[in-house]
Amino acid sequence: MRQKDYGIIIICLAISGGMFYLAAIQQDPIRQSREKMGLVMNAALENAPPSLAFATVAMGAFRGLVVDVLWMRAEDLKEKGQFFDAKQLADWITILQPRFASVWDFHAWNMAYNISVTIPNTQCQERWRWVRNGYELLRDKGIPLNPKSIILYRQLAWIFIHKIGDVSDDCHLYYKKELALSMRSLLGDNASNGIFDELAEAPQTLDEAMADEQTAQFVAALQKADTAFSQTEKLVEQYLSLRQTPDRFAPGAFAVIDQFRESSGLKKFDTFARASQIRHLWKMDPAYMRKMNQIYGPANLKDPNQKEPLNWEHPAVHAMYWAARGLEIAGRPEQYRVDEKNTDRIIFHGLQMLYRSGKTTLYTTKDGQTSFFQRPDLRMFDSCDTIWKKIIEKYEGLEKGNPKAVRGGHKNFLEQAVMSFYQAGHVNIALRIYKDLITRYPRDESGYEYEQYKLSMVEFAKWQLKSEFSSLGNDDATEFIMMVLREGYFRYAVHDDDEAAGREKMVQEVYAMFQKEHSDESYRFGLPSMELLRYMAFMDFLNDPEYPKELRMSLLGRIQVERPDLFEKLKKQEQQYFQELQKQQQAQPANP
């Protein structure tokens, strides 16, 4: 072999060695990138289904290539609008690569958003099934397999706060109602802190629950009354079904509940059953729910240190739960990540949503259907404000003191809160918020001082009102006043008295402002008397079929008791309504 050949061989070996070295030093960065993307986990898959266990072992190194091909095909089908076909491919990808968080994200979004809207909006029940499939996929499968992937928590929270909690879907009221009914069956109406204490401390397993003698006696009696309760794995589900639909079971089954109604055994088992359903069906921890109540719960307006439980019937609370869990389990507080910031935002947007619509009213209409209505909850202000300030502080450090969007949103929130509390009659709270607003945000980003912040709180509120309604014409002002008054009557009918009073106060100020603005043009401008507008709006409310008749009758009932003088004046004009009210009262059984 010639000298030249030896030289070539040595050079090739040197190049090969260098390439091996370069490949070796890339292993750590590649591994770190895979860990950040959630593609590598140290823990082995546990309790995996046979199909998943086979696929992850049998295909070996070729799984990645197959997943790449399937993923590209799924994206192509999505772009073409073939969502059902894309769903099937996503199913396969999640089996082949269960630790690929992006495909779980895509799969859930596809079902909750794309597939659901292909169903006509007249079939809300079917749409709801696909929305539920989307969040259940993440909650029950994706997150357990990828517990360190914050994008899955964020997506799960987003489905609750946007798809269910917002108004973008034509069936959003149906989604809200179904979620509220599901949670009310487990938590009851207006659950207290004591209820959450009991749920958090309830036994974790049936064996632990049965260790109580009276609980064991109750379960034994229930199993004796109906064989449907003999299967222990379905005992909790069947018991909760018995409480909701007793006609499905033998007559003696509900008699057992009546028999044990005063015993501690029934109460303890009922608490265990509801806690078990929350843990296993909803995948939420009652102890963490209690912690959420303590951190984010609504504060008593008279005593801010006294916190009430969150409204777990509201989709925003579920969004906050999963966002908070994601930040706790998968967050990295010392690093700035867009996904983490977006998850943080879900929490304070959820709090803001609760502030604006945190109270829910479920009522049964004459045809037996359940209707749903949301209204503001001013008690959420302190929690929302506190968390918002903490998030601003967090991102001031991570973004080098420049979280503009977060600060700007907080400023707008404070301005709106001043108006809301002032209109609701909570002047002292409005003044406290206003002082914080003008101290925290005295000038804009360019250094310009806000002139309106130099006004007193009352003058600022009037300035805000004037800036919003100064351009109203005669017809616009009349329409606005009539609509707000009708809304006020609705609030009064559902016993939301603070909001009703706020609507009344706003109307009076707009009316006075408009009349003063056009006092020199009374021959051309001018509104009817306030008494006439109020009466006409009241009659419009009573005759508006969009408001359930039960609520209209409820308003009349309150007026009859609390304002008998007004009741007599209205009696002549609305005789037919009062006759129906009297019939309803006569039909009700007398109290024993």
What are these regions (language model features)?
Residues Y153-G165:
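Acidic helix/loop microenvironments that form the catalytic cleft of cell-wall polysaccharide enzymes
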Residues M111, R127, S149-Y153:
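Aromatic-lined, polymer-binding surfaces characteristic
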Residues C124-Y135:
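Non-membrane alpha-helical structural segments and their capping/turn regions in soluble enzymes
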Residues M1-F106, N110, N114, N133-D140, ...:
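N-terminal alpha-helical interaction modules that lie
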Residues M111-C124:
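Substrate-binding clefts and substrate-entry loops adjacent to catalytic sites
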